Amino acid sequence: MEEPPVTLASFTLDDLLAARIENHIERVSEIAAQASGEADILKNIEEIRVAWETTNFTIKNYRDTKDRFYITEIEDLTTLLEDHQMRVQGCMGSRHVARIRADVEAWERKLGTVSDVIDEWLVFQKSWMYLENIFNAEDIIK
């Protein structure tokens, strides 16, 4: 009669001893190191995810208008973005990333997109503010 498969819930120290785990210490150590490395990477990615879930742009009314806004206090956001991009690059360089590479690459793309959007937004905002001043000048309005 065949024994039922061992499940995590029923796995015991006796099962390890019966498998002669002491003969496989090197392999067990490799697996443990890989799992620990993956856990560190996943922890980093989770911290980044949580940070971006709660991060907001700071916007203010442009001059005394009620319907025109601009982004302000961008330095903290840029610092956070650069820090997270470096952390993701560090994760990508880890030897433990192989099995979770797709998740890390996804965050690399997301952060790259955020960076591109912020850069374009700031270029547009600077141009808009410049043109706003020109077209609202007294001699142009008349």
Task: Please name every model-derived segment.
Residues M1-K142:
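Extended amphipathic alpha-helical elements
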